[in-house]
Amino acid sequence: MGDKDDVRIGVFVCHCGVNIKASVDVEEVVEYAKKLPGVVYATDYPFFCADPGQEIIQEAIKEHDLDRVVVAACTPKIHENTFRNCVKEAGLSPYYMEMVNIREHCSFVHMQEPEKATEKAKDLIRAAVERAKRLEDVPTKEVEVENSVLIIGGGIAGIQAALDLADQGFKVYLVEKEPTIGGNMARLAKTFPTDDCAMUILAPKMVQVGNHPNIEMITYAEVKDVDGYIGNFEVTIEKKPRYVDEDACTGCGVCAEVCPIEVPNEFDLGIGTRKAIYVPFPQAMPLVYTIDMEHCIQCGLCEEACPQDPPAIDFDQEPEEIRLKVGTIIVATGYEEFDASKLEEYGYGKYDNVITTLELERMINPAGPTEGHVIRPSDGKEPHRIVFIHCVGSRCPGKEEKGEAYCSRICCMFILKNAQLIKQHEPDAEVYCCYMDVRAFGKGYEEYYERAQKQFGVRFIRGRPAEIVEDPETKNLIVRVEDTLTGEPMEIEADLVVLGCGLVAPEETYSKLADILGIDRSPDGFFKELHPKLEPVSTKVRGVQIAGVAQGPKDIPDTVAQAKGAASEASIPMSQGKVEIELITATVDEDVCGGCGACAQVCPFDAIEMVEKDGKRVAEVQDVACQGCGQCAAACPSGAMQLRYYRDEQLMPQIEALLAEALEEEEEE
């Protein structure tokens, strides 16, 4: 760090068009900045992020011999790298630039209070100047990148990302917790708005994955631990025992034919049954049987029937631990339906003939448990009058007990597709859709919505049903709803009610992976992107990308597009072969360190080790593993642990300057 009394600071206040200037008096702020100790130059400009604005900064650095720069503009998330590169081109260290967010923190939050916005901008700039005086250069380190990638999740997002990366020559490890890849898309009959057969477009990609020389599928497995950093992630995977030799099994199915045990089929959401030895669906990849040991009675019939010599059945299989080293990671985990039983007024789980859209999907699917026939679970008869209810568990802000606040994006179209498929199968059926709003946002979606109304005669009622009551004799369902367009209360007697359930993040899976990978989750439970517009597939952990529903609910086209984006992002460091890591990391004053180990205990990245040096136990930081979170510095009782670029001697003067006027007023009182 330079001598804080000798630095020459330039302050540059951006208008951001009118975003800042409309609320902040930028000219007044500039005049204020000129009087701050250490500031030798200050000016404003409409767009400092544009080329002319950056030229102004670079010329000022040279003309006024500036060695520190403060840019008061918008969020650093968008333009910090822009201004770092700008000052670097002018000959300064990029770390000698301090950025102040006076758009989100001043202008936007005080849009109707220009005086407050202006005074707050002054306070923030005053504090930034004090920090700028003490900024230090940050060393960097170049590390080799492993030429392989881990993809977590074998749905359509994981499949597409795997194929894109494998085709570029990278080694891909595709980990899926189920016995087969395919995800929820494999459950679907058709896809909207083109009504393509879902398996017809998914299965070829599954086969490509299975046959690709650069892809290693690790199914029936879960990621248990991840250590390391971009370019060098060390991954531990636990592969569950199938009790069937994957190399020996040919998928002939003779074992399932002789198995005497039948249990509800989770792939069919409990509608159909499967044997204790099974494949989830005929097109499974890999086509290898799995023994459900929870229900298996170990009668040995499957082993006797197996035509392989020796039999592929292996009751002695144990969990296998697999260790990998990869350069990048893509998280492509999926979703589960909202638990509709939480809404007692709809009777899901209580009334036999109330089902969800995904359960209906398995009925409509010709390869499903009912071979494409929609039936009432109560009596097996085909329903004549069906009521769909939109937004079950979605769009419930402030009513957490009723569901999630967000829109799940696909539910409306999911219902429209199934409503049309029912009408195609049974033209005389009466189909009602109770909706709040129909959100047909994608390409061809509005036309698909119109087709449901005009061509198929699906009836739409604008209103969320208040309750569903079952007739105990007929098992029919009375749906009570008010049409908010006409104000008319209605009672519809339905043979079958289908709940359009929202998409939610499986809590156990997402919470575990967030902890293992060190990535954040959004308030909706899905994984949080680095920036919703500019970095939609990146996370706060460099080298870890997200794709598909892992980032939030979306349809298949958006999922595939995002998977391709994540694959592209993951390929960059692997193509380059090396990455430069800025070492904004923890540092240890070994003379002060007492060797207590508190820092190592709180480090979420296992970047700190306790070692012996000169007969003394001290902390040692692995720079490339440290993510600069600062938890160790906060936990250190002696002050020996500091975070480079965010040291106490840099932050405390900034805080004192920020509070200076408030403290002066307090003293006067």
UniProtKB/Swiss-Prot annotation:
[4Fe-4S] cluster 2 binds at residues 259, 296, 299, 302. Residues 239-270, 287-318, 584-613, 617-646 form the 4Fe-4S ferredoxin-type domain. Keywords: 4Fe-4S, FAD, Flavoprotein, Iron, Iron-sulfur, Metal-binding, Methanogenesis, Oxidoreductase, Repeat, Selenocysteine. The keyword Transcription regulation does not apply. It comes from the Archaea. Gene3D superfamilies: 3.30.70.20, NAD(P)-binding Rossmann-like Domain. [4Fe-4S] cluster 4 binds at residues 603, 626, 629, 632. [4Fe-4S] cluster 1 binds at residues 249, 252, 255, 306. Binds 4 [4Fe-4S] clusters per subunit. InterPro entries: 4Fe4S_Fe-S-bd (IPR017896), 4Fe4S_Fe_S_CS (IPR017900), FAD/NAD-bd_sf (IPR036188), HdrA-like (IPR039650). FAD binds at residues 153-176. [4Fe-4S] cluster 3 binds at residues 593, 596, 599, 636. GO terms for molecular function: 4 iron, 4 sulfur cluster binding; metal ion binding; oxidoreductase activity. Pathway: Cofactor metabolism; coenzyme M-coenzyme B heterodisulfide reduction; coenzyme B and coenzyme M from coenzyme M-coenzyme B heterodisulfide: step 1/1. It is an enzyme of class 1 (oxidoreductase). Its EC number is 1.8.98.-. Pfam families: FAD_oxidored, Fer4_7, Fer4_9. GO terms for biological process: methanogenesis. Its cofactor is [4Fe-4S] cluster; FAD. Part of a complex that catalyzes the reversible reduction of CoM-S-S-CoB to the thiol-coenzymes H-S-CoM (coenzyme M) and H-S-CoB (coenzyme B). PANTHER family: COB--COM HETERODISULFIDE REDUCTASE IRON-SULFUR SUBUNIT A, FERREDOXIN:COB-COM HETERODISULFIDE REDUCTASE SUBUNIT A. The ferredoxin:CoB-CoM heterodisulfide reductase is composed of three subunits; HdrA, HdrB and HdrC. Belongs to the HdrA family. This is CoB--CoM heterodisulfide reductase iron-sulfur subunit A 1. The lineage of its organism: Archaea, Methanobacteriati, Methanobacteriota, Methanomada group, Methanopyri. The gene is hdrA1.
